[in-house]
């Protein structure tokens, strides 16, 4: 799995059927690759929820999303696995097929919820308008393979 984590002051996702938004927290762009498994879901969810990327009273990155009362906006993003080696049009054969990817994306969101953080989501497999107000900016890419962070 590949997940782009952005610390935000606010973020929202909208399409014809949904509108979800959060205030302070994390916006996650979640990519599910061909080799992604349930072990990756658990490993990366734990790592992200516990990531100390919010400032404490001394300005040091020392607090996680729960400690600041933040929420998570999780958005599926198959384009994170784009192959751009040949030509000018990206290929997406490195992304897991939609049905399997959606299953792991949903499992990932459930894993985040198990840590007691509020999680809102986009709608899998649809075009969406994503509005992100980065805070910092703090942007970190997490990758997991075979249940280990790489």
UniProtKB/Swiss-Prot annotation:
It is an enzyme of class 3 (hydrolase). Its EC number is 3.1.1.96. The keyword tRNA-binding applies. It catalyses: glycyl-tRNA(Ala) + H2O = tRNA(Ala) + glycine + H(+); a D-aminoacyl-tRNA + H2O = a tRNA + a D-alpha-amino acid + H(+). HAMAP family: Deacylase_Dtd. Homodimer. This is D-aminoacyl-tRNA deacylase. It comes from Staphylococcus carnosus (strain TM300). The gene is dtd.
């Amino acid at each position: 799995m590949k997940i782009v984590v952005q610390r935000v002051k606010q973020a929202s996702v909208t399409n014809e059927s949904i509108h979800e938004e959060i205030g302070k927290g994390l916006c996650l762009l979640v990519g599910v690759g061909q080799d992604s498994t349930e072990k990756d879901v658990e490993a990366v969810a734990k790592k992200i929820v516990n990531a100390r990327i919010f400032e404490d009273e001394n300005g040091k990155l020392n607090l996680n999303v729960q400690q600041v009362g933040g929420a998570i906006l999780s958005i599926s993003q198959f384009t994170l696995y784009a192959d751009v080696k040949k030509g000018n049009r990206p290929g997406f054969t490195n992304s897991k097929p939609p049905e399997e990817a959606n299953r792991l994306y949903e499992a990932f969101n459930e894993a985040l919820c198990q840590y007691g953080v509020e999680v809102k989501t986009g709608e899998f497999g649809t075009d969406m308008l994503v509005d992100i107000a980065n805070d910092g900016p703090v942007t970190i890419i997490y990758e997991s393979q075979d249940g280990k962070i790489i």
